[in-house]
């Protein structure tokens, strides 16, 4: 039996920044301490919810059909979510890894090391949603972000992943001693999650989408580190939670890339390399950029276009504008 719930790393960062803003002495170590404090509170809250789930699901939503397909519920006379089976797959999905990792890296570089911004100025920028401060916003955004090999943001992503996994796996739920499986999966709701989130230190405006699952943000690698699907695949493989609960890789490839000689072989090699590096799930679309943009502008003109969203497929025309936009945003044409 399985169930899943999300832990919002972006909210832990938000509350951590608010805590730090109220302090007279501010440093990166204190921000990390406050971030981990709130992240732990969120994980414990989800665990408590699973204890409650274990007690009430058999009364409110028994698995009448699925119970018949498992060994245990009939023999024990118990619903699968209440002791009827030996294995309960209770998941916690972390989200916005890149949003948080890039934010920590931007603070470390621009505030702590280079001192191009003070802590007070950083908080002012966040509180005013970067109003009239585009230069400073871009300065925070244009660091070597998560996904760039050897970047400080990548180091932060691994550190955050490790702490989050330890919180999930370090102890079972308090009441019924249920084990939790950590993962990193935003289920496509990056706009919904970002809508109520204030500006973040990675240059993201208030209300903008957060990053997908454990993926780098679109456009993460520029200049020397030319953007490529390989860098994205490596970053996602590097930050897997490690217990089988997936952290998906979205690959949206222009058909022009695979129509050239060797293109298909290169794509097959990328898929195999990602899986061998520890990847757990690939959501892939191969469609021309021109067709995708036209379908986004006029979905009804392309009623038969099917796309992989995130963990499931759907007719592109059936998706909301926000869901279509995230597919366009992550589209890879380089």
Spans of features found by a protein language model:
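Short, small-residue-biased leader/transition segments that mark boundaries at the very start
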Residues: 3-8
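Catalytic phosphate/nucleotide-handling subdomain of diverse soluble enzymes
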Residues: 93-129
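Catalytic alpha/beta core of large soluble enzyme barrels
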Residues: 55, 59-63, 70, 164-318
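Internal maturation/activation junctions in enzymes
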Residues: 50-53, 78-82, 115-211
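Conserved phosphate/anionic-ligand binding catalytic regions in large, soluble enzymes, centered on
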Residues: 81-108, 316-319, 323-324
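N-terminal low-complexity, intrinsically disordered segments
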Residues: 44-82
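Metallocofactor- and cofactor-centric catalytic cores in central/energy metabolism, strongly enriched
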Residues: 28-43, 57-60, 64-65, 290-293, ...
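Glycine- and acidic
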Residues: 20-35, 79-90, 142-149, 249-256, ...
């Amino acid at each position: 039996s399985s169930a899943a719930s999300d832990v919002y790393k972006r909210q832990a960062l938000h509350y951590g920044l608010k805590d730090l803003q109220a302090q007279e002495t501010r440093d990166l170590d204190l921000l990390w301490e406050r971030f981990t404090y709130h992240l732990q509170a969120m994980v414990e809250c989800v665990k408590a919810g699973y204890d409650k789930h274990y007690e009430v699901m058999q009364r409110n939503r028994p698995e009448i059909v699925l119970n018949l397909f498992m060994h245990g519920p009939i023999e024990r006379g118990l619903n699968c979510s209440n002791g009827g089976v030996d294995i309960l797959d209770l998941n916690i999905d972390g989200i916005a890894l890149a949003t948080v990792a890039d934010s920590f890296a931007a603070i470390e570089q621009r505030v702590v090391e280079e001192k191009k911004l003070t802590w007070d100025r950083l908080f002012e920028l966040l509180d005013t949603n970067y109003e009239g401060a585009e230069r400073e916003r871009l300065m925070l955004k244009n660091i070597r972000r998560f996904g760039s090999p050897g970047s400080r943001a990548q180091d932060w992503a691994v550190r955050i992943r490790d702490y989050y996994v330890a919180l999930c796996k370090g102890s079972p739920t308090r009441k019924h001693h249920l084990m939790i499986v950590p993962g990193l999966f935003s289920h496509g709701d990056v706009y919904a999650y970002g809508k109520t989130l204030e500006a973040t230190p990675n240059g993201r405006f208030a209300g903008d989408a957060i990053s997908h699952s454990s993926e780098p943000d679109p456009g993460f690698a520029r200049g020397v580190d030319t953007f490529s699907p390989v860098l994205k695949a490596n970053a996602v493989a590097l930050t897997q939670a490690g217990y089988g609960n997936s952290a998906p890789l979205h690959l949206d490839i222009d058909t022009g890339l695979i129509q050239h000689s060797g293109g298909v072989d290169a794509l097959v090699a990328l898929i195999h390399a990602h899986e061998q590096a520890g990847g757990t799930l690939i959501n892939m679309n191969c469609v021309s950029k021109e067709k995708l943009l036209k379908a986004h502008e006029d979905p009804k003109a392309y009623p038969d276009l099917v796309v992989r969203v995130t963990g499931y497929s759907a007719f592109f025309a059936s998706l909301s504008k926000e869901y279509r936009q995230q597919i366009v945003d992550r589209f890879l044409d380089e």
